[in-house]
């Protein structure tokens, strides 16, 4: 049986953009930070309809990594950490990692 860190993992982001220009600047720089950790954007889209509960974010992104360790390595990397102030100025973002 695989250990949790060996299972594929995803980072899911729920995003409410406050400054479109800063958001585009941030978004355009993220891809380069994903590659060293095997990350790839699986889905990026706008909210179509809430089917149950509440969901205020307008955008959702799903990023796949080969493992939870890789996902956390990406988030903790100096390259991504440098982008966080720009992300915080651009949008309200909830990021959650999942393994499985």
Where are the model-predicted features located?
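C-terminal structural segments of small proteins and small subunits
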Residues: 68-96
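Short S/T/G/P-rich N-terminal loop/turn motif that feeds into the first structured element of a domain
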Residues: 1-59, 66-76, 99-100
